[in-house]
A protein has these predicted regions:
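Enzyme catalytic cores with a strong preference for nitrogen-chemistry domains
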Residues: 1-282
Length: 282
C-alpha cells in the first residue's frame, strides 16, 4: 500500500467503509493514509468532509508533518506516525483545527534510524524510516462526551505510560489502539497483540477499541473481555457500542510498585535464608 499506485485505491476503500457506517466515531488503522492528510486528493477529502459534516467523527492513522524545533539549529519539518481526529463543528477547515496524537515509542529501522545505520535503511528501501517522536503524555481526544486515549502499534505494551495518561488531567474513559502489523503476516503476533491489549484494559479498567489493517480488530470491555472482533485478513467494519468508564484501579494508582516490592522482598529472603540456616551439626 506504500506504492503510489496503491495509495489511492487504499484511501478509496477506507472512505467507502467510513461512508457505509453511521457511527459517532470511526477509527481507521495505523497508516490507513500513507500520505499526509493535506495531500489527500480533493474529491476524496470532500467525501470525508461531507461524512464528518453529518455529525460523525473519524480518526485516521497517517503520517503527519511536524515542525521540529532544534536548539541552536534551524527548525525542520519531519513526519510523525500519527492519528488525526476529524470531527463535526469547529473551523471551516477541519484539518487545521484537528487534534492529533503522535507516536512516541518508535520502532528501530522501521520508524527511526539508529546512529550509524542509515546505510542499512537505504539498502533495505524502508519507506518513511525516520519519523519524529511525539510527547510521552498527550491529551486524549474528546468525542461524544468521552475522552479517548490513543496509542499506536506496540505502544500498548507499555502499561506504565498508559497509566500516566489516565493520571494526567481529566484522564481518559476509553483506550484506542491503531496498528499496522502486516509485517508479521499470519504469525502468532496477531493474537499476542490482542492479549496485550486485553491486559491493558484489565489493568486500567478501561474499554479498548482496536483498529488494524490485518487483525486483530476488536472491542474489549473494561474487564479485559473481547466483546466483538473481525476475522483477521478480512475487509470489513466492526460496529460496536462502547461505554467509557472512570475511576482508578489499584494498578492505575500504584503502578508496578507492589510487584517490585514483592520481588525485592523475595530476593532479600532468598539471600538471608541460607545464612540463617547455617551449617548443620552431626
Amino acid at each position: 500500500k506504500f506504492r503510489p499506485e496503491r495509495t489511492l485505491a487504499a484511501m478509496q476503500s477506507y472512505i467507502g467503509l467510513v461512508e457505509s457506517g453511521d457511527a459517532a466515531l470511526t477509527i481507521l488503522p495505523e497508516t490507513a493514509w500513507t500520505i499526509p492528510f493535506e495531500r489527500t486528493p480533493p474529491a476524496l477529502a470532500q467525501r470525508l468532509d461531507a461524512h464528518v459534516g453529518k455529525g460523525h467523527a473519524v480518526a485516521i492513522g497517517l503520517p503527519a508533518f511536524t515542525l521540529e524545533q532544534k536548539r541552536g539549529l534551524r527548525d525542520d519539518w519531519r513526519l510523525t506516525n500519527s492519528v488525526l481526529l476529524l470531527q463535526p463543528g469547529g473551523a471551516a477547515d477541519r484539518y487545521a483545527s484537528a487534534p492529533r496524537y503522535d507516536k512516541h515509542h518508535l520502532v528501530p529501522f522501521g520508524e527511526f534510524i539508529p546512529w550509524g545505520f542509515a546505510w542499512f535503511v537505504n539498502l533495505m528501501q524502508i519507506p518513511m524510516g525516520d519519523f519524529g517522536r511525539g510527547a510521552t503524555i498527550q491529551a486524549p481526544f474528546a468525542v461524544g462526551g468521552q475522552r479517548i486515549a490513543f496509542n499506536i502499534c506496540y505502544e500498548d505494551l507499555f502499561g506504565e505510560e498508559i497509566r500516566a495518561v489516565l493520571l494526567e488531567g481529566s484522564g481518559a474513559s476509553i483506550l484506542a489502539n491503531v496498528s499496522n502489523i502486516a509485517w508479521f503476516g499470519r504469525s502468532h503476533a496477531l493474537p499476542q497483540h490482542l492479549q496485550i491489549a486485553r491486559m491493558r484494559s484489565l489493568e486500567t479498567g478501561r474499554p479498548m477499541l482496536r483498529a488494524t489493517n490485518t487483525g486483530m480488530t476488536a472491542a474489549i470491555d473494561a474487564g479485559g473481555k473481547v466483546i466483538a472482533q473481525l476475522e483477521p485478513y478480512t475487509v470489513g467494519a466492526l460496529d460496536v457500542s462502547v461505554q467509557g468508564t472512570s475511576g482508578l484501579t489499584p494498578f492505575t494508582r500504584l503502578g508496578n510498585l507492589p510487584i517490585l516490592l514483592l520481588a525485592i522482598a523475595a530476593l532479600a529472603l532468598a539471600l538471608i535464608a541460607p545464612r540463617r540456616s547455617g551449617p548443620s551439626s552431626a
